[in-house]
Amino acid sequence: MQTNKRLKMASCVKAAAMLGMLLSVSISTTAQADSWRGWNIHPPSYPNGKALESFAKEVAEKTEGRVEPKVYHNAVLGDQPDAIEQTRSGALDFANFNMGPMGPIVPAANVLSLPFIFKSPDDMYRIMDGEIGERFADALAEKNLIVLSWFGSGARSLYNTDHPVETPDDVEGLKVRVMNNDLYVQMIDEMGGNATPMAYGEVYQSLKTGVIDGAENNYPSYESSGHYEVANYYSLTEHLILPECLCVAKASWEELSEKDRQAIREAAEDAAKEQRALWEEGVQASKQKILDAGVKINEVDDKSAFQAKMQPIYDQFVQEHPELESLVTDIQDAQS
């Protein structure tokens, strides 16, 4: 009897030990799998949404499941200012941010909102992919945001109901809707126009009824909003070309091995290539649609006259932010 009891007890001890080992392995495996939450303001069908989904899939594959990102689209986790703070604190793991609203966090980002700071989207990509882009990335890193790659958001151009805009003088007297930003109000005013900040949803009817004469936006937005139906002169001023960043929270980044960091950087670079290509496809599709509708599109080959008109804006900006003067100059010199 004593022998049987000892055998039963030994069996129980072995079973308990084995169960403990299994639980340990299970807990260890769970701990190694890091579920990342990502923020995106756009719908999943948008170029950014598609590229971010590709990023999430590639990260999971390249890290062999150690990092499993999930993208939350349509700003369901908050608006951009909220998402910026959540990512800085580590409550969110990654996000795609437009650099326009980043100014209150990173003052250098305000340089990117200066009218005509970039001559073309290609110039913007080239500059942001190089040493100057690294400066912006360093500034963001100081605020706990690790930049992995740069996306594009198109080039905003002027459109109106009356005539092509080929020189700044062609803006004189036009009532132009702009975003509620002092830089953009001043941009139109410096060209002799009447800047009119207005809610985006009111623009179509205001163009149709003559409350305003024009507005400004990129090809896809001009087309999808239907503004081309009531304002059929689209002039490629490309006065505002804002980059976007694919960022990771510093807290999340510091938990990674060097191997996984490299894999995630590669996935982010692939996502940037995809986003840029998809954006260009969307631009071409929108352009063809508005051409088919009879919109008159004109190139603005020489932007120097427009840039000269912006000098008072630049002078005021540098006076208020003297520490950013060299950054402004370096971006301009890189396109000369």
UniProtKB/Swiss-Prot annotation:
Pfam families: DctP (PF03480)
Signal peptide span: 1-33
Subcellular locations according to the entry: Periplasm
GO biological process, one term: transmembrane transport
Any GO MF annotation of the entry: carbohydrate binding
Classification via InterPro entries: DctP_fam (IPR018389), TRAP_DctP (IPR004682), TRAP_DctP_sf (IPR038404)
UniProt keyword list: Periplasm, Signal, Sugar transport, Transport
Stated role: Solute-binding protein that binds D-glucuronate (in vitro). Probably part of a tripartite ATP-independent periplasmic (TRAP) transport system that mediates solute transport into the cytoplasm.
Summary of subunit composition and partner proteins: The complex is comprised of an extracytoplasmic solute-binding protein and a heteromeric permease formed by two transmembrane proteins.
Family: Belongs to the bacterial solute-binding protein 7 family.
Protein name: Solute-binding protein Csal_2479
